[in-house]
Amino acid sequence: MMEQGKDCREVVTQLAASRNAIDRAMGLIVSTNLEHCVRESLEKGEDTQNLVKEAVDLLVKSR
């Protein structure tokens, strides 16, 4: 876009849209994986607190 001489606002808008799409995809992937891991841990009688904390920490760190 920059090589095409697009306005700076257009470039920033596209970058923000890309970031938003990636953030949503990451959220979906992490939540799906977390759900699977929690179910598996519950079936084994294991504590799920650490799994949830790790998932939240990963999401926070990725921002």
Swiss-Prot record:
A biological process term (GO) from this entry: negative regulation of DNA-templated transcription
GO cellular-component term (any): protein-DNA complex
Gene Ontology MF annotations: DNA-binding transcription repressor activity; metal ion binding; transcription cis-regulatory region binding
Pfam families (alphabetical): Trns_repr_metal (PF02583)
Transmembrane segments: none
Protein name: Uncharacterized protein YrkD
